[in-house]
């Protein structure tokens, strides 16, 4: 079974059925045999951006979490192993949420689904 970690924007684009999703990403997301994961950092990022007025959604955070559950997207905590990897990451990427997501991908050996070009500079598999 293939296992993938979703970047924050991928979750939102999936929720909105956004045409910005690549064909490769869409194929993975539509495959019922894949196992999808999301870092709690993504929900934290969404919450902060909403509270700052930088992100407006047509649905609540609760509805987004319900959608994750309905789509069998497993929400992962930030644990000590993730923090150990995060501490050693070079500062190629300055966004703290993306750094946590990248560290989670590395820790759990999950392919990261993301359009983020900077994420590709780390030693984790990025699919787009």
Question: What kind of region is each of these model predictions?
Answer:
Residues 8-9, 46, 86, 105:
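Generic structural signal for small/hydrophobic residues in well-ordered secondary structure
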């Amino acid at each position: 079974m293939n296992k993938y970690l979703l970047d924050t924007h991928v979750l939102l684009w999936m929720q909105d059925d956004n045409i910005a999703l690549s064909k490769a990403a869409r194929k993975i997301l539509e495959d019922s045999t894949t196992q999808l994961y999301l870092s709690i950092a993504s929900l934290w990022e969404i919450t902060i951006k909403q509270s700052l007025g930088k992100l407006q959604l047509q649905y609540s955070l609760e509805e987004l979490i319900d959608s994750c559950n309905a789509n069998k997207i497993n929400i992962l905590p930030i644990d000590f192993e993730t923090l150990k990897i995060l501490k050693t990451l070079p500062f190629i990427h300055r966004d703290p949420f993306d750094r946590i997501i990248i560290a989670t991908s590395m820790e759990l050996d999950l392919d990261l689904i993301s359009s983020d070009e900077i994420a590709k500079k780390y030693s984790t598999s990025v699919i787009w």
